[in-house]
A protein has these predicted regions:
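Conserved RNA-binding domains used in RNP assembly and mRNA/RNA metabolism
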Residues: 24-126
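Glycine- and charge-rich intrinsically disordered segments
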Residues: 1-30
Length: 126
């Protein structure tokens, strides 16, 4: 059986929970920085992040390369932080001036070291 003090406690918890759900956290996206972007279906990209809409998950990219295949890093996190140890084995596409990608899953800022290595990878074409 519920006593009135328990009911009030439950109500306060519910109210606090709902208030916390309604608070929106403001994210600072690395606009203007070189990033690696992973999408749900379009793949992985290296680019300058021009804009990002968190509600639609659409990222606008500038000077963009598709990362088709890489070796020399175990993950995109390592690639963004350290670059690749095997640049000759990587398949990075030609640059595209502007691109929009949907269903963005990850935006990983690149370190200066990684930028230098990634931009040194030769363009892969067939």
């Amino acid at each position: 059986m519920c006593v009135p003090s328990q009911v009030r406690q439950i109500d306060k918890t519910t109210i606090n929970f709902n208030i916390n759900l309604n608070k929106q956290k403001t994210m600072n996206y690395p606009i203007g920085k070189r990033v690696i972007v992973r999408t749900n279906r379009a793949g992985v990209f290296y680019a300058t992040l021009s804009d990002f809409d968190a509600q639609t998950r659409i990222a606008e990219l500038k000077d963009c390369r598709r990362i088709h295949y890489w070796e020399g890093a175990c993950s995109l996190s390592q690639l963004a932080e350290e670059g690749t140890k095997n640049p000759d084995s990587c398949r990075f596409s030609m640059y595209v001036p502007v691109m929009q990608v949907m269903e963005t899953i990850e935006i990983i800022p690149c370190s200066d070291k990684a930028i230098k290595i990634i931009e040194g990878v030769e363009i892969w074409k067939k």
